[in-house]
């Protein structure tokens, strides 16, 4: 795992097309903004896990 330190307003790049910007810090919460192409899915981890669980469930008709 790569660990980076960023201040509010600073950005990191993932590849050529994805940026992650620190928008604010309040207590133990960090607000981030993600800019990515439409074909790149961006989800919070708990939402991603729910999507994956739904995909693995058999479809009943």
Swiss-Prot record:
One of its GO terms (cellular component) is cytosol. InterPro entries: CsrA, CsrA_sf. Its main location: cytoplasm. One of its GO terms (molecular function) is mRNA 5'-UTR binding. Gene3D superfamilies: Translational regulator CsrA. GO terms for biological process: mRNA catabolic process; negative regulation of translational initiation; positive regulation of translational initiation; regulation of carbohydrate metabolic process. HAMAP family: CsrA. Homodimer; the beta-strands of each monomer intercalate to form a hydrophobic core, while the alpha-helices form wings that extend away from the core. A key translational regulator that binds mRNA to regulate translation initiation and/or mRNA stability. Mediates global changes in gene expression, shifting from rapid growth to stress survival by linking envelope stress, the stringent response and the catabolite repression systems. Usually binds in the 5'-UTR; binding at or near the Shine-Dalgarno sequence prevents ribosome-binding, repressing translation, binding elsewhere in the 5'-UTR can activate translation and/or stabilize the mRNA. Its function is antagonized by small RNA(s). Belongs to the CsrA/RsmA family. PANTHER family: CARBON STORAGE REGULATOR. This is Translational regulator CsrA. It comes from Pectobacterium carotovorum subsp. carotovorum (strain PC1).
């Amino acid at each position: 795992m790569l660990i980076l330190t960023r201040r509010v307003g600073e950005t990191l790049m993932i590849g050529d097309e994805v940026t992650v910007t620190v928008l604010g810090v309040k207590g133990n919460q960090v607000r981030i903004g993600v800019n990515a192409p439409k074909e790149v899915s961006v989800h919070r981890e708990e939402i991603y896990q729910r999507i994956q669980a739904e995909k693995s469930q058999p479809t009943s008709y």
